[in-house]
């Protein structure tokens, strides 16, 4: 809701100052893109602890459930 009020206020202020309609539309597109990128950055920062937790859980599960290779099937011996 606050974003909508910002866009409407931005539009009105550009009209009052005498900017052309094409300039207003261009400014609204640029402002929308900047607000979108800012929102995505804020969301990424907000979710970062959960993403790190998910990575840690996967790492622990892979460490616990590592495939056990029998000694006779290892491929680290010399080949002739």
Swiss-Prot record:
InterPro entries given in the database record: Phageshock_PspG
Compartments, record wording: Cell inner membrane
Induction of synthesis: Up-regulated in response to filamentous phage secretin protein IV. Induced by PspF and negatively regulated by PspA.
GO biological process assignments: phage shock
A GO-annotated cellular component: plasma membrane
Topology class, membrane: Multi-pass membrane protein
Transmembrane segments: 5-25, 41-61
Keywords, sorted A to Z: Cell inner membrane, Cell membrane, Membrane, Stress response, Transmembrane, Transmembrane helix
Its biological purpose: Effector of the phage shock response.
NCBIfam families: phageshock_pspG
Name of the protein: Phage shock protein G
